[in-house]
């Protein structure tokens, strides 16, 4: 059995097992005996959407505008393609190089090469009513859009999540659940993070936003949902001005340092 620290879910702790076909049933039955719970493709699809992972036929392959979706339209391409000299030449290298250079310029808000990468896949969050579905047209109120679609939803659904209490390191995952409609969209490359959009859902335009990510994996063993409309934490109450509190803290640190230097005996051999 080969075990790889890879996956298609975005979870910080997860593995893929590779075994001979003849052994697959044994491993399946054994994992079930040990408490594993099987899930269907629907669960996998919601997880990969949360992690902004592409799926062929949605974020890769044919585009609804005609032609194929460029490789560098998918954010993960920057990790998958190498132009190192030792790689040598390969089929498609020149085209990928043009896309890569356009991608770099676009990241710096330089759209001079946008013709080589006119659209990109980006995560979107629906703040209005409804559920995102593949093919829904996306609009922008910016003048340059001229009222025309600036892209379309490539993947979308309603996804459950566990609600949390507290902030930062004190965050606690509760048993209470919520739902949110998120997805991925193929958008004009001039659109970037925090861009306000409108998505046509069965004839009604609903507000949406481009986000950096739907989940974060910084605190294993669980991912945390990122909710753009989550209220910001209240600023900590402080009776004294910050400058005075900082000065008092520095004074305490200095006194502690002198105490350790001159009034303590080092008992460590």
Question: What spans do the regions from the language model cover?
Answer:
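Glycine-rich, acidic
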Residues: 1-117
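Short Gly/Pro-enriched turn/cap motifs at secondary-structure boundaries
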Residues: 6-8, 126-128, 176, 263-266
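A generic alpha-helix structural signal
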Residues: 28-31, 135, 250
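A glycine-rich phosphate-binding loop feature that marks nucleotide/adenosyl-phosphate handling sites
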Residues: 43-52, 203-204, 213, 266-268
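Glycine-rich, small/acidic residue-mixed loop/short-helix segments
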Residues: 71-242
């Amino acid at each position: 059995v080969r075990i790889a620290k890879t996956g298609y879910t975005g979870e910080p702790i997860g593995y893929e097992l590779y075994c001979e076909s003849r052994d697959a049933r044994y491993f399946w039955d054994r994992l079930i005996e040990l408490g594993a719970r099987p899930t269907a493709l629907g669960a996998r699809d919601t997880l990969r959407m949360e992690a902004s992972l592409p799926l062929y036929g949605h974020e890769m392959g044919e585009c609804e505008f005609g032609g194929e979706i460029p490789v560098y339209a998918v954010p993960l391409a920057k990790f998958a393609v190498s132009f190192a000299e030792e790689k040598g030449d390969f089929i498609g290298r020149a085209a990928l190089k043009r896309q890569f250079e356009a991608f770099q310029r676009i990241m710096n808000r330089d759209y001079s090469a946008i013709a080589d990468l006119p659209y990109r896949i980006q995560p979107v969050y629906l703040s209005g009513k409804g559920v995102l579905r593949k093919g829904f047209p996306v609009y922008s109120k910016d003048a340059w859009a001229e009222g025309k679609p600036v892209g379309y939803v490539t993947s979308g659904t309603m996804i459950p999540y566990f609600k949390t209490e507290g902030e930062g390191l004190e965050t606690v995952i509760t048993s209470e659940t919520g739902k949110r409609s998120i997805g991925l969209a193929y958008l004009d490359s001039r659109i970037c993070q925090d861009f306000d959009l409108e998505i046509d859902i069965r004839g009604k335009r609903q507000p949406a936003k481009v986000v950096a990510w739907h989940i974060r994996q910084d605190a294993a063993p669980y991912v945390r949902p990122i909710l753009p409309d989550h209220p910001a934490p209240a600023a900590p109450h402080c009776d004294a001005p910050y400058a005075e509190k900082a000065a008092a803290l520095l004074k305490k640190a200095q006194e502690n340092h002198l105490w350790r230097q001159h009034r303590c005996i080092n008992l460590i051999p």
